[in-house]
């Protein structure tokens, strides 16, 4: 079990079943199977889904801030500001994704056309930090979802409840269940996650953990 404690009081506020190798593999396989259909959705559809997620954050700031403060210990005002500020970043991604991934010609001749086009990576791991989970996580999973990827989201064990809340809001907003999956646990869960045949890994955390991730995924030339 993963025990979540309030760092200000030491009180236990939740006990959660941790993922294991079997459940991580199952979540990966489900994400892999679901991702092509998500990528096939027209971009405006995915934009609408993430816009609903932004609206859900905006309408639930107080409750979400209370959860964030209870498990990280940051002042409630800072938690509110983080959630409110993250909606501005989401707006940026909503407004800029279409132009960023648009196919563009770089050379055209009588018998040749060269162009740059973009495709989703596929299934990506998002290993996030505890101190600003809405900023740090959202900087990865929002553009990843907008561009047609499936996300296996491993929040810090010190911000797990917030990670679960993010997952619930995304699913209620229209992100399919297996396109965004939350993994529960500490460093061992992250280590097991990156052993899966994922297509990319995005990490924010300590230098030592970053080195371990690089040693695991570097030979596979992951993004």
PLM features per residue range, with description:
Residues 1-112:
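N-terminal Rossmann-like NAD(P)+-binding subdomain of aldehyde/semialdehyde dehydrogenases
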Residues 16-25, 173-183:
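Histidine- and aromatic-rich ligand-binding microenvironments
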Residues 17, 127, 152-156, 183, ...:
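Active-site-adjacent beta-strand anchor residues
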Residues 22, 59, 63, 74, ...:
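Short alpha-helical
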Residues 31-34, 144, 163, 217:
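Small-residue (primarily alanine) positions within well-ordered alpha-helices
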Residues 90, 163-166, 193, 213:
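Hydrophobic packing residues within well-ordered alpha-helices of enzyme cores
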Residues 105-177:
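Conserved small-residue-rich beta-alpha loop and adjacent elements
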Residues 123, 174-223:
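Conserved NAD(P)+-binding/catalytic subdomain of aldehyde/semialdehyde dehydrogenases
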């Amino acid at each position: 079990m993963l025990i979540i404690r309030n760092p200000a009081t030491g009180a236990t506020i939740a006990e959660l079943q941790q993922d294991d190798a079997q459940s991580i593999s199952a979540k990966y396989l489900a994400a892999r199977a679901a991702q092509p259909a998500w990528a096939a959705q027209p971009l405006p559809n995915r934009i609408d889904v993430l816009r609903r997620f932004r609206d859900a954050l905006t309408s639930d700031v107080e409750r979400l801030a209370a959860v964030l403060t209870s498990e990280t210990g940051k002042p409630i005002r800072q938690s509110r500001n983080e959630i409110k500020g993250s909606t501005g970043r989401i707006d940026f991604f909503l407004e800029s994704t279409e132009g960023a991934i648009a196919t563009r010609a770089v050379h055209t001749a009588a018998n040749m056309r060269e162009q740059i086009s973009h495709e989703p990576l596929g299934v990506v791991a998002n290993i996030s930090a505890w101190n600003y989970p809405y900023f740090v996580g959202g900087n990865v999973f929002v553009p990843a979802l907008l561009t047609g990827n499936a996300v296996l989201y491993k929040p810090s064990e010190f911000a797990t409840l917030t990670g679960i809340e993010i997952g619930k809001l995304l699913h209620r907003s229209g992100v399919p269940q297996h396109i965004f999956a939350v993994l529960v646990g500490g460093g061992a869960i992250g280590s097991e996650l990156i052993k899966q045949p994922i297509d990319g890994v995005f990490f924010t955390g300590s230098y030592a953990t970053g080195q371990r991730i690089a040693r695991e995924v570097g030979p596979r030339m992951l993004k």
